[in-house]
Regions:
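C-terminal ends and interior cores of transmembrane alpha-helices
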Residues: 93-112, 274-288
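Glycine-rich segments within core transmembrane alpha-helices of 12-TM secondary carriers
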Residues: 145-168, 328-346
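Linker/hinge segments immediately adjacent to helix-turn-helix/homeobox DNA-binding domains
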Residues: 36-41, 67, 194, 214-294, ...
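Intracellular loop-helix junctions on the cytosolic face of multi-pass helical membrane proteins
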Residues: 2-12, 147-148, 161-237, 251-264
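Intracellular juxtamembrane helix-capping segments at the cytosolic ends
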Residues: 130-144, 306-321
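Helix-loop boundary and gating motifs at the non-cytosolic
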Residues: 8-68, 219, 223-238
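Hydrophobic core of transmembrane alpha-helices in multi-pass small-molecule transporters
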Residues: 115-134, 291-307
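Helix-turn-helix DNA-binding segment
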Residues: 397-457, 461-462, 472-480
Length: 480
C-alpha cells in the first residue's frame, strides 16, 4: 500500500510540469499520425483491392530504401531539409501521386496489365514520398528536447492507429479521399511544426565531420531481419504499421514517460526487445491461445520497441555531437531492406519443401542465435556512454532539463522573437537568463568584453529595459 500511495503521489505531482512537455504537440501528432495512417491504408494493410504480380509492400520498401540511401549520401548538401519547401513538396507530391495511382489501379476499368503497372508505380512513389517524409520529420523533431521527442513520437504513432481505425469502416470513395488528404495534412502539419520552432533552435546548415554509430544500426538490422522472417505470417492486429500491437506498445511507453519521466529506465527498455522477440519465435509452433496470435504480438511489439529506442539513441547522439540527425535517420530508413531480406529468406525456406515444423524450428533457432550475438556484441552501453556521450540509458536520463529550465528557455525564445534579437544576442540572453555574469558569458562564447557590452546594450534597447535587473524581471528570473 505505501508503494501504491507513492505511485499515485508521483502521478498527481507536477501536473503543470507534465503539461508543459505537451505544449505544441498537435502539429507533430497529426504529421506523423496522418503519414503512418496513409502508409497503412495504402500498402501495409491495403484498403483497396489491388492486383499486382508481386508484393506491393516490397516495392514500397525498396523505393524507400533507395531514397534513404540517396539522402544519406547527399545529407551535407541537402540540410537543412525544412529550410525551403522543395523537399516537402516532393514528398507530398509523391505520396499524393501514389494515392491516385493506387486508386486508379483499384477502381478504373483498365486492362489487368495496366492495373498492375499502376499499382507498382503507386507503391514505388509512395515509398519515395514516405522516405523523404521520415527524414523531414526527424530533422524537425531533433530540434526539441529528448523527453518531448519520446512523448511526441509515441503519441503520434498511437494517433496513427486511431486514424486507421476511423478510416477502416469507410466505403471506397471515402477511403480514396482519405488516401489523398492524409499525406497533404501530414506535410502541412510538419511545416507548421517547423515554423513554430524558435529560429535559434532550427537546424544548422553547417555539418561537422562525424562517424556513424554502426553498432546501433547493426542492432536494428538484426531485429529488422528477424521481423521480416515472420511478417507474412503475423496474425491480424499485429505488425509494424498502425496496428493494435503498435497501439499497445506506444500507449505504455507514452504513459510511462508522461507520468514517470524522472524514473523511466530506458536502459531496461533497451534490453527488453530481446526477451520479447525470442519468446515470440519460440511460441510459433505452439497451439491454442499461446500460439500464432501471442507469437505475432510479441514479435511485432519487440520490433516497434527497438525502433523507438534506436531512434531515441540517434537523436541523443546527434544532439550531443552537434551533427545533423538527417544522415542517421536516412540510414535507419534504408535498413528497411533487412525486413525485405527476412521475408525473402522465409520464402526461400518455404520453397525448399521442408515441413512447416522444421521451418519454424530453423527460423526460431536462427533468431535465437542472432539475438544472443546481438546481446554479446552490440549491447555495449559503456561504449555508448564513453564514445557517443549517450546518457538516456540511465534512470531518468530522458529528462535533459527541469520544467523550470523548459519554462525559462520558452520565455527567452518568446522574448527573442518579439524583440527580433540576432542569433548571437539570443545566445547571450539565454546565458543571462541562467544567471551567468559577464566573465562567464565571455568565456563560454569566446568574445571580448567590448563585444559583450555592445551586444548587451542592443538587447536592453530592443527589449525596452535599462539594466540587467529589469531584464531579469522581464524574463521572470529569480536572479538579477
Amino acid at each position: 500500500m505505501p508503494a501504491m500511495g507513492k505511485l499515485l503521489a508521483d502521478i498527481r505531482k507536477g501536473r503543470e510540469d507534465r503539461a508543459l512537455y505537451l505544449a505544441g504537440i498537435l502539429p507533430y501528432l497529426f504529421a506523423l499520425g496522418c503519414a503512418r495512417a496513409w502508409v497503412t491504408l495504402a500498402v501495409a494493410a491495403p484498403a483497396l483491392r489491388l492486383a499486382a504480380p508481386f508484393d506491393l509492400h516490397d516495392v514500397f520498401d525498396c523505393a524507400m530504401v533507395l531514397i534513404s540511401i540517396a539522402v544519406a549520401l547527399a545529407a551535407r548538401r541537402l540540410v537543412p531539409l525544412n529550410a525551403t519547401g522543395a523537399v516537402r513538396a516532393v514528398s507530398a507530391g509523391a505520396m499524393v501521386a501514389a494515392s491516385l495511382a493506387l486508386i486508379a489501379a483499384g477502381a478504373a476499368p483498365l486492362p489487368e496489365g495496366a492495373q498492375a503497372a499502376l499499382a507498382v508505380l503507386g507503391a514505388a512513389l509512395g515509398g519515395l514520398g514516405f522516405g523523404l517524409f521520415l527524414v523531414l520529420w526527424a530533422e524537425v523533431l531533433s530540434c526539441i528536447s529528448l523527453i518531448r521527442i519520446f512523448l511526441y513520437t509515441t503519441a503520434s504513432q498511437l494517433a496513427g492507429v486511431v486514424f486507421v481505425f476511423f478510416c477502416s469502416g469507410l466505403d471506397g470513395l471515402r477511403v480514396a479521399c482519405a488516401m489523398v488528404v492524409l499525406p497533404v495534412a501530414a506535410i502541412l502539419c510538419l511545416r507548421m511544426a517547423f515554423r513554430a520552432l524558435p529560429v535559434a533552435d532550427r537546424p544548422s546548415p553547417v555539418v561537422p565531420k562525424f562517424t556513424y554509430p554502426w553498432k546501433i544500426f547493426a542492432l536494428l538490422a538484426l531485429f529488422s531481419f528477424a521481423y521480416g522472417l515472420r511478417q507474412h505470417q503475423l496474425a491480424a492486429g499485429a505488425g509494424m504499421h498502425s496496428s493494435l500491437s503498435t497501439a499497445i506498445v506506444m500507449a505504455v511507453l507514452f504513459a510511462g514517460a508522461y507520468f514517470f519521466s524522472s524514473r523511466l529506465n530506458i536502459g531496461a527498455l533497451y534490453r527488453s526487445p530481446f526477451v520479447l522477440i525470442v519468446c515470440g519465435f519460440l511460441l510459433v509452433p505452439s497451439e491454442g491461445v499461446f500460439g500464432a496470435a501471442v507469437s505475432s504480438y510479441l514479435i511485432s511489439m519487440s520490433y516497434s520497441l527497438v525502433g523507438i529506442i534506436v531512434a531515441l539513441l540517434l537523436y541523443d547522439i546527434a544532439k550531443r555531437l552537434g551533427v545533423t540527425v538527417v544522415a542517421f535517420a536516412a540510414v535507419k530508413g534504408a535498413e528497411q531492406i533487412f525486413v525485405v531480406g527476412g521475408k525473402g529468406a522465409s520464402e526461400a525456406l518455404g520453397a525448399a519443401g521442408l515441413p512447416a515444423s522444421m521451418q519454424d524450428a530453423l527460423i526460431a533457432g536462427l533468431v535465437v542465435a542472432m539475438m544472443v550475438a546481438a546481446m554479446l556484441i552490440l549491447l555495449s552501453e559503456k561504449e555508448l556512454a564513453s564514445r557517443w556521450g549517450v546518457r538516456i540509458l540511465d534512470v531518468g536520463g530522458l529528462v535533459e532539463k527541469t520544467p523550470d529550465e523548459e519554462r525559462r528557455e520558452a520565455r527567452v525564445a518568446e522574448l527573442a522573437e518579439h524583440a527580433r534579437l540576432t542569433p548571437r544576442e539570443t545566445e547571450i540572453l539565454h546565458l543571462i537568463a541562467q544567471g551567468k555574469n559577464g566573465p562567464a558569458i565571455r568565456s563560454e562564447l569566446f568574445i571580448a568584453e567590448g563585444t559583450l557590452k555592445a551586444h548587451t546594450s542592443h538587447i536592453y534597447e530592443k527589449c525596452g529595459v535599462a539594466n540587467r535587473r529589469e531584464l531579469a524581471a522581464l524574463l521572470g528570473s529569480a536572479r538579477p
